[in-house]
């Protein structure tokens, strides 16, 4: 599809080159992987899965192009078993997509001004802004220390708790600037690494329950593979 070149395209095409039957693209995203596989292999039928509402429009293009070999379900890959089928292959390309990063209004990027959101599905759950204002200290520690692997997590959590007592963050750049002020070691020890990198990653993983879905998804994958 125009505007997006999948990073893992060649490796994925090689992996599934001789696969016949049904394949689940559990992280449809921009649809680049599904499109490339459908073009390469006429013996493959693909079901794309994604909870991002914007993926629906991109999926409709493939539906028109491959009406008998492609379909789409707006569910998380952890819900594969709800389809009631078995599959010959399952593809998962985890993390945030370039479509989501490039759209500042989605709130995934700390380099562009946008609402502090980060939800894979903006219609459900807490946004990053809401999470930052309401999460307990332990929830913040889990997100920033465990999921983000931020070495200065103590300082970050302490300052978040203090700041939110009388203030709140509204945008990505506002929060990124806040992190820049409270992670000064990056400037001397990690030149070129933005101080918001790990914290944004941790928040995204936390509010989307990415590891929880991965655990359920892997179990479901083993249960549904032929």
Regions found by a protein language model. Name each.
Residues 1-226:
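S-adenosyl-L-methionine-dependent methyltransferase catalytic core, i.e., the SAM/SAH-binding region
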């Amino acid at each position: 599809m125009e505007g997006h070149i999948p990073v893992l395209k060649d490796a994925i095409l090689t992996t599934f080159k001789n696969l016949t039957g049904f394949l689940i693209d559990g992280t449809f995203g921009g649809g680049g992987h599904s499109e490339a596989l459908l073009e390469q292999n006429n013996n493959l039928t693909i079901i794309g899965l994604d909870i991002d509402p914007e993926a629906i429009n991109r999926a409709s293009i493939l539906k028109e192009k491959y009406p008998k070999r492609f379909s789409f379900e707006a569910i998380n890959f952890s819900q594969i078993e709800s389809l009631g089928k078995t599959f010959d292959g399952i593809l998962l390309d985890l993390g945030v997509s370039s479509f989501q990063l490039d759209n500042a209004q989605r709130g995934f990027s700390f380099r562009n001004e946008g609402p502090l959101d980060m939800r894979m599905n903006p219609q459900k759950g807490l946004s990053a802004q809401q999470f930052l204002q309401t999460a307990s200290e332990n929830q913040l520690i889990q997100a920033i220390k465990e999921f983000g692997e931020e070495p200065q997590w103590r300082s970050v959590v302490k300052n978040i708790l203090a700041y939110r007592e009388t203030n709140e963050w509204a945008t990505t750049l506002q929060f990124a600037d806040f992190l820049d002020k409270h992670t000064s070691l990056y400037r001397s020890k990690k030149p070129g690494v933005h101080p918001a990198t790990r914290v944004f990653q941790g928040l995204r993983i936390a509010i989307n329950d990415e590891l929880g879905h991965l655990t359920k998804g892997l179990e479901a994958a083993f249960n549904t593979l032929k």
